[in-house]
């Protein structure tokens, strides 16, 4: 696997994409969308950030977020979200064996300027 370099810039805006494992349409189920919002609320208590925009599609989601200047590491935020979502997904369904919901890693893009911001908002 290639090594990815993530750029953590305090107070920056970041466009993030997380995709489900094998692009399974997890978010076609309204119960999973509720779980998405509940997980997000819990994670935001530990990793506060501003949600500038979002979209939830059947097999992935996009966030445009801004982190506080003292917490620029969004990898911890994404790890926590994906982990908590998976744990609660299993708990709700009383699943004890391993379940893979997410693709490894995630895609991120640090917003460079106003034009870049508008391009990602329009996406």
Q: Where does each model-flagged region fall?
A:
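Short catalytic/metal-binding and nucleic-acid-binding patches
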Residues: 1-123
């Amino acid at each position: 696997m290639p090594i990815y370099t993530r750029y953590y810039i305090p107070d920056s805006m970041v466009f993030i994409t997380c995709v489900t494992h094998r692009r399974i349409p997890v978010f076609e189920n309204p119960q999973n969308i509720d779980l998405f919002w509940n997980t997000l609320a819990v994670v935001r208590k530990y990793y506060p950030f501003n949600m500038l925009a979002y979209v939830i599609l059947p097999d992935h989601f996009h966030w445009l977020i801004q982190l506080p200047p003292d917490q620029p590491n969004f990898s911890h935020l994404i790890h926590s979200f994906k982990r908590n979502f998976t744990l609660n997904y299993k708990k709700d369904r009383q699943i004890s064996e391993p379940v893979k919901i997410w693709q490894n890693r995630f895609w991120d893009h640090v917003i460079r300027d106003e034009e870049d911001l508008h391009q990602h908002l329009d996406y």
